[in-house]
Amino acid sequence: MTPSKYKDEVDSLTLAGLDKIKAKDQSVVALGYNLAKFRHGKLSKAELELINHDFKLVREAGMKCLIRFGYSESIGEPDAPLSIILEQIAQLKPILRANADIIAVMQAGFIGAWGEWHSSTNGLDNAADRRKILFAELNALPKSRMIMVRTPYYVWGIFDRTTPITRTEAFNGSNYSRVGQHNDCFLANWNDYGTYVDTTVGHEYIAKDCLYAPMGGETCHVSKYCEPGNALYQLARLHWSLLNSAWNPEVYKLWEKEGCLNQVKKRLGYRFELLSGTYDDSLGVGSGFHYSIRLTNVGFAALFNPRDVQIILQRNSDSDRYAASLPIDPRFWEPGDTVDVAGEIGIPLNLPAGEYSLYLNLPDPVPQLHSRPSYSIRLANIGVWNSSTGFNSLDARLQIVRGPAAAAYKGKATFRRLTAESPSSR
């Protein structure tokens, strides 16, 4: 994750700048908006247009963004009154909703120094006001999107609950199920500069809660806790998905020197590897195609936003493509898990005969992103990714022949022809 605007690091967002970030194999850019000049009133039309334009550029670049809004860049610098914050969230709601598909996650922001929910000059650093602001933000986003809060303690105060999200309530759209964590003093000292009231309890909570909610943030400075063994352990235990690539550079230099930086980069968030697969290799139309795929997640975390899973048939003679969506939610492919995906899909009677190559596709479920390769998940295996389609090769072939099916398929899942529209290059 690369920051682009917060703390005046970059004055304006450009497509060329985003392309440079993307060339580093980073797919999420952090957009931080300092609203200091709007502490006493509505956001201007120009500010709203700027935010909307930034989202447009992120979309054009084929990336997603993490967003945060705030007023203060130091302790003692003013934030805004509650009424102003709620009014501005209401102003932002149409823009956030219209661009939710390219928002990876939102940080709660607004309150206090750096939008980190402490040192509020308007007395907003209390559970009641935090609740009003967080609930307004959750309402401003669709239920498919989540918000990161600065510490577990703040979440517990807002919801009057200290137990983590359970597997049964994960992704159910409730406010609690949509709240994750960001730690902007990761590995700084024994309690990450006050991130944890009780570090043991906080870590135990996040280790379970952030199996189903996002965890991210940044390091502060080099400390004994940044030692690679501990860093990798905590990144894995707490299920980190996003890490500010710009801060702190000294920590990254240490990790590079000690040989663990590449592992951190590879394992942030999910990282799916294909282990094996078995598939029918010759079928008549009207038959059922049987598949069995085994994958593992070697990343620190799982997916926290919705994602489709498809098997693709691509005819080798003319590249016609047919897709079938699988009845599975990959957000439950947890770190360390080995996952077996198996089932049967019908071969339509009108499917042309010929040889087909098999692919696994994990596209964004939102229609406007679904066919864009940049928004499909690339498996970690070498040589399986097709950057022009976003498909992952299963290294298997299926021969379709005309004639009666050996056994007629009676299920509902079938392959359907993909539209002729070519996927975007981004």
PLM feature spans:
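Catalytic-core regions of glycoside hydrolase
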Residues: 105-112, 116, 120-249
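An active-site-proximal structural segment forming one wall of the substrate-binding cleft
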Residues: 46-64, 79-107, 127-140
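Solvent-exposed loop/turn segments at secondary-structure junctions
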Residues: 34-38, 71-76, 110-114, 152-156
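Aromatic-lined substrate-binding rim segments of carbohydrate-active enzymes
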Residues: 13-72, 82-85
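Catalytic cores of secreted or luminal carbohydrate-active enzymes
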Residues: 226-279
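Extracellular/luminal regions of secreted and cell-surface proteins that mediate adhesion/ECM remodeling
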Residues: 262-426
